């Protein structure tokens, strides 16, 4: 940033700090962009009269200032923070840095969009040599004070002194890991099982050892004044916005880099002051299933990070939260009934206020409840659907809000596979953990994030196994098919993140023992040591682990899904068709609500299942030496084309089906193997050498821009005739059966209106022949695929012959960018990483050029033919962001793969709702 801009940033007059607490606040829940989600909700809870520890929020704009100033603070910010600190002291009756009555604070990040665990938190700021004695005197609890101090040293050295400074750990051991190891060694030497068994004197000694280790490893003293700790923490939170894991999460969730994070400085309340103190995380409804039951976990004598970190199995909040792992642990409902009742009332008040499921963090200090956070809770796709429909039924939200509550990706998750119940029934169960995120996952074992990414990169499926996950594992968690951890509860990091992504996850699988050195894992119920690379299967709905590869199957549709989709369809104007190449695809798409087929590729009958005979006939035609021989070979092929067309039209009775004529270059179908060459040679009565010679003659330097699509049909009109005859014969036969077939014929790779006119003449001639032979009137639509820029730019002329356009955005993107779709992976990562482009244009439509060509094509075509139907049949037809754009430019329908049909239906409705506001 240049100096003038820095001056503008430094001296611009604006409010940088917003105070909250004492049942009042300067901000409110609408100010997410400025205060971040956490700050806005802390302000809103304060305004609602809830017990929120006082504090203040430094705005997201200050994050931009911090980076603009090269990691510094304006004088205005320093003054505003000082004033807010005084106001906080007044409410809490304590003073920051005071030797006798010290106020301690926490420092937490808060982006406007929830990023659980991706940025950093520091607790107990203000504990130093000057305040420790006063804190001990005031609380009468030296063990609590030194436990709080050791936590500060661990967090601050990790977040501020190492990560924020960009220091790479030596030998892969971060300062936090080294301090954790020191504490574990102390427990082992003393025979302690729990942290709470460590005595006050032992904790005091440990704190001194920690500080010495910090100096040894990081080369600087641990800060020993409250002021230094506070400003170091504020900077550490700002820097964590650009930490590796935060950047990786933003890439996955598509959160803009320039949003920045707010910083929330809040008075500390303590859950680690004894048996009448606790900390917990709760959800106003079950985040895994959507059930309308209060759900959560808590830990006695602990601080907030202990629950989320998943270091020990927490207690259940109530009866609804009990499972096989925590059934014998005391619930908050029975241990502290009055506190539980107050918390239950608060969750109902919050949910009714925000009209959405709330994720709540709370602390109980010596029997008093304090609310530390509320936010819209992450949930699985199944839970999102359940909650949306339940809240609609309860009158809490309207239909449009219900539609907007389920993300398109969550619908994808609902349709995700489950383990085949029949196979699962006879499989051997290895272990059971907590069902943190539902569905089935099958994959090979990996133990590190890096290994998971490597497997996924090679197209494999893996299960990431960890003691517990940390935010550093974020990319590996994304890459894995499923996640399995030894420790942690239903609100641990692994559970929260997996639920947000709809990824199968089991946590708290305590029977599992991991040996990282040997790269093995054993399950006490099985005994066998499983090595990295071996297959296991997870049932995330029940928390079950199996030591074998179990096949998966589609989750059955439930009435809730059907009812939800019926509401969705009321609010969209875009039609949704499917790309289907087989009758099976067509039937599946129809069950998902497809309104027709936008792309049936005739050449796909020559690939895959049952393709051997038609492919042999096609090869025979290709390798014939004369047109007479080719026509004879085509007559053998025609019945196969007709059969595929007829069965598809039958399934889609009364719905349009777009048949695209043969598109690929002929050389793609030339036999490669010696035995297939020999078979073809024998069929044609020529030598293998002659077959090879004829095959070689079809070779092109640049086949994707060579003899393919319409060019093939202009060069060999009888190939087009065969396809037209098959389509019209199938149509006539179905009409005679009393059905209502609706064929639409699409010519690919066109660049000229004359190409279309040439083909239309052949098509109409063949149609007339079939009508005469069958005494049946046939109705069809004739159109073209617009996939070359010239076709889009001359669309007014193309519409003379074409009754519909279907934009093939895959090739249109290829031709516009000059990127090869097959080779784009070699550089796309660098282009995205260096922000040369914002999105992969093959996944999300490029609105600046490709999108403009589509829009220009629509306008040009309709200037000639006002009733011209326009559709999309590229991969973009199933991309929610692209659908949102298509909804604004006059597209009539999008076409996508069968499993993306529900996603496209939802995305189209959401686009219409958002754009009509």
Spans of model-derived segments:
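Nucleotide/phosphate-binding sheet-loop regions of phosphoryl- and nucleotidyl-transfer enzymes
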Residues: 2-427, 435, 460-463, 470-472, ...
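Conserved alpha/beta-domain cores
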Residues: 108-109, 557-560, 567-917
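Short beta->alpha connector loops at strand-helix junctions that form conserved
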Residues: 56, 486-488, 507-511, 600, ...
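Extended, non-globular alpha-helical segments
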Residues: 433-472, 523-563
């Amino acid at each position: 940033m240049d100096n003038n801009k820095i001056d503008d940033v430094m001296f611009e007059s604006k409010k940088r700090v917003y105070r909250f607490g004492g049942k009042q606040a300067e901000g409110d829940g609408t100010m997410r962009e400025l205060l971040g989600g956490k700050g806005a909700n802390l302000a809103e809870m304060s305004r609602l009269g809830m017990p929120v520890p006082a504090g203040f929020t430094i705005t997201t704009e200050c994050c931009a200032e911090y980076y603009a100033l090269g990691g510094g603070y304006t004088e205005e910010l320093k003054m505003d923070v000082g004033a807010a600190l005084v106001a906080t002291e007044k409410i809490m009756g304590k003073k920051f840095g005071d030797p006798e009555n010290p106020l301690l604070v926490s420092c937490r990040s808060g982006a406007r969009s929830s990023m659980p665990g991706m940025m950093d938190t520091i607790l107990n700021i203000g504990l130093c040599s000057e305040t420790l004695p006063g804190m001990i005197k005031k609380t009468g609890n030296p063990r609590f004070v030194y436990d709080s101090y050791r936590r500060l040293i661990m967090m601050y050295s990790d977040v501020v002194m190492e990560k924020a400074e960009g220091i790479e750990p030596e030998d892969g051991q971060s300062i936090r890991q080294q301090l954790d190891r020191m504490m574990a060694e102390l427990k082992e030497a003393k025979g302690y099982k729990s942290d709470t068994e460590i005595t006050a004197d032992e904790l005091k000694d440990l704190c001194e050892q920690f500080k010495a280790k910090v100096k040894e490893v990081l080369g600087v003293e641990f800060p020993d004044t409250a002021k230094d700790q506070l400003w170091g923490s504020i900077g550490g939170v700002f820097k964590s916005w650009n930490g590796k894991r935060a950047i990786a999460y933003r890439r996955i969730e598509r959160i803009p880099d320039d949003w920045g994070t707010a910083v929330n400085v809040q008075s500390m309340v303590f859950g680690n002051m004894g048996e009448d103190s606790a900390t917990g995380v709760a959800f106003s409804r079950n985040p895994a299933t959507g059930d309308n039951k209060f759900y959560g976990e808590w830990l006695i004598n602990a601080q907030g990070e202990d629950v989320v970190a998943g270091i020990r199995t927490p207690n259940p909040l109530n009866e609804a939260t009990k499972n096989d792992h925590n059934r014998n642990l005391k619930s908050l409902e029975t241990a502290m009934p009055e506190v539980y009742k107050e918390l239950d009332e608060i969750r109902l008040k919050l949910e009714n206020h925000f009209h959405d499921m709330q994720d709540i963090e709370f602390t109980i200090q010596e029997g008093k409840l304090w609310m530390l956070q509320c936010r819209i809770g992450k949930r699985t796709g199944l839970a999102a659907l359940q909650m949306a429909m339940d809240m609609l039924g309860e009158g809490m939200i309207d239909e449009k809000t219900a539609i907007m509550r389920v993300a398109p990706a969550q619908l994808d998750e609902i349709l995700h596979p489950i383990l085949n119940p029949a196979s699962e029934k006879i499989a051997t169960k290895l272990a059971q953990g907590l069902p943190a995120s539902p569905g089935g996952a099958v994959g090979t074992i990996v133990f590190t994030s890096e290994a998971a990414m490597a497997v996924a990169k090679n197209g494999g499926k893996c299960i990431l196994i960890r003691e517990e996950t940390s935010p550093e594992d974020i990319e590996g968690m994304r890459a894995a098919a499923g996640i399995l951890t030894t420790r942690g509860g239903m609100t641990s990091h692994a559970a929260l993140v997996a639920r947000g992504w709809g990824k199968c996850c089991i946590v708290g699988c305590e029977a599992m023992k991991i040996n990282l050195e040997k790269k093995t894992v054993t399950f006490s119920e099985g005994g066998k040591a499983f090595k990295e690379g071996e297959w296991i299967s997870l049932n995330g709905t029940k928390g079950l682990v199996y030591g074998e590869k179990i096949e998966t199957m589609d989750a059955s549709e439930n009435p809730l899904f059907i009812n939800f989709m019926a509401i969705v369809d009321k609010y969209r104007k875009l039609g949704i068709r499917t790309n289907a190449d087989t009758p099976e695809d067509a039937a599946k798409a129809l069950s998902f609500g497809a309104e027709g087929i936008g792309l049936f590729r005739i050449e796909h009958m020559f690939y895959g299942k049952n393709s051997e005979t038609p492919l042999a006939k096609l090869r025979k035609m290709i390798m014939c030496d004369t047109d007479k021989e080719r026509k004879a070979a085509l007559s053998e092929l025609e019945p196969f084309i007709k059969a595929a067309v007829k069965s598809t039209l039958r399934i889609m009775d009364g719905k349009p089906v777009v048949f695209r004529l043969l598109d690929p270059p002929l050389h793609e179908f030339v036999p490669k193997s010696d035995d297939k060459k020999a078979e073809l040679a024998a069929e044609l009565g020529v030598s293998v050498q002659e077959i090879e010679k004829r095959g070689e003659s079809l070779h092109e330097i640049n086949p994707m821009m060579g003899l393919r699509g319409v060019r093939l049909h202009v060069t060999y009109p009888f190939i087009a005739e065969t396809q037209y005859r098959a389509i019209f014969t199938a149509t006539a036969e179905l009409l005679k059966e009393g059905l209502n077939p609706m064929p639409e014929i699409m010519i690919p790779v066109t660049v000229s209106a004359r190409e279309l006119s040439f083909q239309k003449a052949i098509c109409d001639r063949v149609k007339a022949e079939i009508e005469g032979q069958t005494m049946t009137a046939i109705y069809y639509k004739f159109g073209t695929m617009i996939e070359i820029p010239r076709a889009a730019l001359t669309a007014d002329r193309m519409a003379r012959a074409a009754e519909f356009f279907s934009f093939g955005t895959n090739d249109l993107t290829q031709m516009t960018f000059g990127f090869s779709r097959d080779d784009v992976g070699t550089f796309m990562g660098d282009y995205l990483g260096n922000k040369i482009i914002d999105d992969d244009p093959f996944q999300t439509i490029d609105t600046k050029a490709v999108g403009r060509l589509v829009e220009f094509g629509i306008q040009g075509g309709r200037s000639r033919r006002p009733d011209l139907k326009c559709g999309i049949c590229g991969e973009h037809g199933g991309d929610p962001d692209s659908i949102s754009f298509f909804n604004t430019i006059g597209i009539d329908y999008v076409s996508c793969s069968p499993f993306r049909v529900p996603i496209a239906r939802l995305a189209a409705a959401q686009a219409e709702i958002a754009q009509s506001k």
